[in-house]
Amino acid sequence: MSNSPWQKSPHSERDRPGGLSHNCIWILSAIACASAAQAPERLDRGMVAVHAAANKVYVGWRLLANDPPGVAFHVYRSTAAGNPIRLSKNPVTDSTNFVDEAAPLDRANQWWVRPVVNGREREPSPRAALPANPGERQYLALKLQGAYSANKIGLGDLDGDGKLDFVIKQPGSSIDPGQGYWRRSPDTYKIEAYRHDGALLWRKDLGWNIELGVWYSPLVVFDFDGDGAAEIALRTAPVDADYRDADGHVLSGPEYLSILDGRSGIEIDKVDWIARGAVSDWGDSYGNRASRHLIGMAYLDGTRPSVVVHRGTYTTMRVDAYDLVNRRIGKRWSWNSDQETPPVRGQGMHGMKVADVDDDGRDELILGAAALDDNGRLLWKTDLGHPDVVYVADVDPAHPGLEIAYGVEVKRGENGISVAEARTGRILWGVKHPTTHIHDQGMLADLDPAHPGLEFYGAEADGSRFWLHTARGELLATEDLGGNSPHALYWDDGPVKAYIPGPSRFRRPGPRPQLPAGARPAGAAVVSRILKYKGAQIGEITGRIVGLADVLGDWREEVITAVEGELRIYTTTIPATSRRVALMQDRLYRMDVALASMGYFFPPQLGGKLFE
């Protein structure tokens, strides 16, 4: 099944507050609706050219959901601003990439494509360029404004030109509010917006009242007002006052949800964040549980994206939903887990998942081991407890609808690793042995073509045990695939993913390590391998992974890394022999990419099948 609005029609919206009834005609995976409907993000061809090896230049571009069936492409090059040369003898039909083996690399070059429909060439795409003597490298570099690295990044078209731009939060350090981890913030976070070409658009200092840590400073980049350009929604506080106590905690003072204009960084509007109240109301006296903040977006009415604000993870959870209409933020609904009967406690995750789990055209919110319907009412809860690992995807193709893969942090006698039905929360399968603390992000991906569906990997926090299961729960392996959080990605060709092993940093018994004064270190520019499961190395990247998505080029994914002074966007240079619509035009995938700018980093999942 598919969870993309460009691939299926929602049911009629009825019997829901604010619902709209509309009929849509769905043609070639693109929307053609007679009335208001969820509009796909405008994307251009995403041209990319990298000097892959020797005299070879890899060129890639996007296939779009609204391309006519049978569209083909001619590939062109211009050298030193000279006349165009057509490189493709025949239109390219079986892929959206091309290897140019004759480019004069001692001079500057540009590449572009022209779609061919019914034998006639159409308008050219934007161009990808390489300077003279570019050197061999498999990434594009976006230079930052100083010798710092990004902590988190958000992707979105900030100026409406069809190209994805970058919003970064810097510096790269992050302090956890937990006891034994917290330290006084040595610096303030700055939000910086860069165009796709590296030009700095604006910078905003969040000030001392937003402490230096992921959980204090969530942000999300999305087009909330439907004007074709993305905004930034984030937690803010006054910058002209200092609410730190003597130790450096910020446990008092105003807190806001702000929405910033993507082009300028100017605040469009702000409203109060979910109230802190008494810090102890959240489960401790020192601010850990009160300082767990998340933000996201969801198509709660099936038409326009709402901003979703979340406070609390381990005990109480509160959620507010807002709409940006006529440049004003208005509340849609609120939910308080303590007002349920019985109260819903201890079910939160370190992030948020958004998906249309009941196939009604409107999004639900997966908060961890509990879910809210689009109207802000509790849809279901599993009572598994706080999960570290949460993925929503079409895990098992034989089971209708979406599933949720869980790795549970709290100690359990069974089901610590499990897969649930996303519509109802019903456990489909789970391990029958005890687990102590399934930690970090695990991995969910089609790694082994011998088994249908997606394989699910999870590990104990101390590194004592590892499990790889099939989509149906069959145990495949108990080997360490790279710590608690290896990252899977489409890198070569076909439906099977490669993966990047994570660092083997395990929580061992005993006192927690004393971190350097200030914050957790961002990490050195480590070199990581890209591997096939039970296979060879097929790539290599440098830097700390801060993004993974189909950012440009064909349907394979790019890896975005942070090194001091720059972002690197690594792209595959392995020629593909197949073509697929850009993954960013899958609804579930696009929402996952947007949500990766806050909380735990979970690589995005598709709502439908990549290969039929």
Show the residue positions of the predicted features.
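Hydrophobic h-region of N-terminal signal peptides that target proteins for export
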Residues: 29-37
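Short, low-complexity intrinsically disordered segments enriched in A/P/G/S/L with frequent Arg
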Residues: 1-10, 15-23
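A structural signal for short hydrophobic beta-strand segments in well-ordered beta-sheet cores
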Residues: 20, 49-50, 560
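Short intrinsically disordered, low-complexity coil segments enriched in acidic
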Residues: 2-4, 33, 157, 223
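Beta-propeller-forming repeat regions
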Residues: 10, 40-42, 54-56, 63-68, ...
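Short, compositionally biased P/S/T/A/G/V-rich stretches that sit at domain boundaries
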Residues: 38-50
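Short beta-strand elements bearing conserved aromatic residues within extracellular beta-rich modules
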Residues: 73-75
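Generic short N-terminal amphipathic or hydrophobic helices
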Residues: 22-26, 30
